[in-house]
Curated annotation (Swiss-Prot):
Family: Belongs to the SIMIBI class G3E GTPase family. UreG subfamily.
SUPFAM superfamilies: P-loop containing nucleoside triphosphate hydrolases (SSF52540)
Organism taxonomic ancestry: Bacteria, Pseudomonadati, Pseudomonadota, Alphaproteobacteria, Hyphomicrobiales
Keywords tagged on the record: Chaperone, Cytoplasm, GTP-binding, Nickel insertion, Nucleotide-binding
Places the protein is found: Cytoplasm
Subunit comment: Homodimer. UreD, UreF and UreG form a complex that acts as a GTP-hydrolysis-dependent molecular chaperone, activating the urease apoprotein by helping to assemble the nickel containing metallocenter of UreC. The UreE protein probably delivers the nickel.
Record carries keyword DNA-binding: no
Protein name: Urease accessory protein UreG 1
Annotated GTP binding sites: 14-21
Function, in words: Facilitates the functional incorporation of the urease nickel metallocenter. This process requires GTP hydrolysis, probably effectuated by UreG.
The UniProt record lists the keyword GTP-binding: yes
Length: 204
């Protein structure tokens, strides 16, 4: 099902601990029986996120590739994406019929974005535990990503966050761009994210 232009590449960004790896796992589980898929993770000095996906059984080990970025993680997805482009090329070599590549960035700040050369669609994950004010802080991930995921809604009562305020701020910051409120550890909201990828990415 791969297109003549190669597989659909989906970039998943967001701060450390926001739930990027949880989203990767949920998406792998939903797509692995429908599409030829692989996952690429970015960590500064380790391959921990790749290990987590492997241990969780999200995909076969050979379909998960960990990239050690070193230094500043946003450089590897934006200013100099060569290390990730090489990882995509390696996975295409291993699996010539790839339909979908999920690329998880290393945890970074709200200003991190994916190079258009690397990702066709960008998802950005923030979490309720970071505080009710996070959506209104803005930044490219919040305002310009193709889909914003506000994760860990189950923690709202514990951190004193008002989800209605967060949703209002999200709508104000994003305009007509879509968003999903989710609790990814339980899988809540993951189906909506998967549907968005299929529809926005033109997967069949």
């Amino acid at each position: 099902m791969a297109s003549l232009n190669g597989p659909l590449r989906v970039g998943i960004g967001g701060p450390v601990g926001s739930g990027k790896t949880a989203l990767m796992e949920q998406l792998c589980r939903r797509f692995r029986d429908r599409y030829e898929i692989c996952a690429i993770t970015n960590d500064i000095y380790t391959k921990e996120d790749a290990r987590i996906l492997t241990v969780a059984g999200a995909l076969p080990e050979e379909r998960i590739l960990g990239v050690e970025t070193g230094g500043c993680p946003h450089t590897a997805i934006r200013e100099d994406a060569s290390i990730n482009l090489a990882a995509v090329a390696e996975m295409r070599r291993r699996f010539p019929k790839l339909d979908l590549v999920l690329i998880e960035s290393g945890g970074d700040n709200l200003a991190a974005t994916f190079s258009p050369e690397l990702a066709d669609i960008t998802l950005y994950v923030i979490d309720v535990a970071g505080g009710e004010k996070i959506p209104r802080k803005g930044g490219p991930g919040i305002t310009r990503s193709d889909l914003l995921i506000v994760n860990k809604t189950d923690l709202a009562p514990l951190v004193g966050a008002d989800l209605s305020v967060m949703e209002s701020d999200t709508q104000r910051m994003r305009g007509t761009r879509p968003y999903v409120f989710a609790s990814l550890r339980e899988g809540h909201g993951a189906d909506r994210v998967a549907t968005f990828i299929v529809e926005a990415g033109g997967l069949r």
